[in-house]
From Swiss-Prot:
SMART domains: DnaJ (SM00271), Sec63 (SM00973). Residues 670-681 have a biased composition (Polar residues). Residues 623-653 have a biased composition (Acidic residues). Keywords: Chaperone, Endoplasmic reticulum, Glycoprotein, Membrane, Protein transport, Transmembrane, Transmembrane helix, Transport. It is a multi-pass membrane protein. The keyword GTP-binding does not apply. It is found in: Endoplasmic reticulum membrane. It comes from the Eukaryota. Pfam families: DnaJ, Sec63. This is DnaJ protein ERDJ2. Residues 613-681 are annotated as: Disordered.
Amino acid sequence: MAAAEENSSLFLIFILTMIALPLVPYTIMRLCRAANVKAKTIHCRCSGCHRSGKYRKSIYKRISNFSTCSNLTILLLWIVMIFLVYYIKHVSREVQVFEPYSILGLEPGASESDIKKSYRRLSIQYHPDKNPDPEAHKYFVEFISKAYQALTDPVSRENYEKYGHPDGRQGMQMGIALPKFLLNMDGASGGIMLLGIVGLCILLPLMIAVIYLSRSSKYTGNYVMHQTLSTYYYFMKPSLAPSKVMDVFIKAAEYMEMPVRRSDDEPLQKLFVAVRSELNLDLKNIRTEQAKFWKQHPSLVKMELLIQAHLTGESFALTPALLKDYRHMLELAPRLLDELVKIALLPRSPHGFGWLRPAIGVIELSQNIIQAVPLSARKASGGNSEGIAPFLQLPHFTETVVKKIARKKIRSFQEFCDMPVEERATLLTQVAGLSDEGAQDVELVLEMIPSIEVDIKCETEGEEGIQEGDVVTMYAWVSLHRRNGLTAALPHAPSFPFHKEENFWLLLADAASNEVWLSQKVSFMDETTAITAASKAIQETQEALGASAKEIGIAIREAVDRVKKGSRLVMGKFQAPAEGTHNLTSFCLCDAWIGCDTKTSLKLKVLKRSRAGTRGHVAEEGPVAEDGIEEEEEEEEEEYDDYESEYSDDEEDEKSKGKGKVANGVAHQKANSDIDSGSDD
């Protein structure tokens, strides 16, 4: 067996290898990913967002961003690796192979006279009579004397030159990669050490795995608890009004688990008084309503009051303990709302469609939470059917400012956005009473607000017309434009303390029956992924139609160009319903901005199934009547009035009618639609 020092060195080399194998490639991957991040300003530059500090890269924040658990772990492992390399190198110098020629400073095969000369020279330097240093004495006895003896003795020299060792042929040595203290252990402490190794290497990882699995089993892939999804599914109803969505949202298990402290009672009472007008309490029975409100589960009371404090701007009065709960509540809100939308859109029997009304209500709630705008601001007022909510998301805007500009016949948010810049600046400074800096902030935010345009087409691949039972494919190009030229951007949300990306929900729905036939989430943040997805979808579609390689290449290039210009391809399939003309509406709703949603009306004519039962025999039956579709921006009172936003009173429909015959299932919605998200204008 090898010496204990060699075994210790082997053990350290083993540990170093185990650390380096995963650490080196992972570090390279992290560095490459960091190098590819583009330093581009995509957030709002108004004074409100600047003061919020979300995007301010101070030294402390940069250190905090770097000082994550993963980064600190990587740094610590690299320090351990460097220490191990240094220590192994030092140990390997101490544990040296016996080399007599090297010890005497000679080349292999030196003559006997050279050996004697070198020995005399080293003796003068290291001999105890010449050098009293104990280390010199030790080196002289253990190395120099032995080396001289090995090279001057004929037998020893011959053995060394032949076998590499003065004692002749040596047996093979094997080392064990274990530390020295384990090899020199007696039987009494061996059992304790064995138990320690078993506990550290087997039991501890097993316990960590059990704890992790027990906790992770409570959550879905989107880090939402399974209990939350079950609760949302149970309370989700097809007739759920937007004003009642809040009651379902706050029942999340994550919120129910938040602590309720006795010290919070008095601050919550004061908060209740401040936000009471937003709680939908019946003023005729106010005492009964208040008593009923406080009889709810304490966590529900606390969450609703904290959300209303955020929507009404009363969060500044929260105590430190409530402020911590408030921030945690807002941190969880985006992904909980995202899951709540998915629950509303979940296909249900008998037709396998989702529900439109609750889905719109959840997205409206998301808009209000991100922009910190009261839900009551969606009520129609002063002839403005969409309410004042879109205005209140602008910096320095209050109800008073909105009333002032309303006197100048500004009837909608879209009219305000479409005004010339100079005229709008005059309106803000001279009528609304804003300063020049305030007017500039408003312009910066207006430049960030997205304008959405949707081109949508429904067809059966490779066939003319749509017959009942066909698999219908929806192709939709969703195009985004901003006045500042950005495609990917973070919304203006100075009151929301966390980063929030824009997401858009494209819903193809039958508003009259409250059914969502198709839904998909659209993001403009990742252009590379969008190009890959669009290219793959176009290629598969063209190949199914039997297009040539050249035609496929041209179609892919056109799709890539559209993506780079700010469009996203959305595709989905659904089964054609029964024969007849179906009045559909495609909604494109943003979860972060108020007032930038669009909807497109289209008619889908479904023909009766041919007698042959296959699409291939349609042509033999005779020509099929060309299906007509009308692209409309008209009154939809019969289709959608029952599903208007609960925040709005009786709203007048002032849309102009524009009809034109185009292919079946095709519609185009220009940007800057005059609709509010969830109510008919």
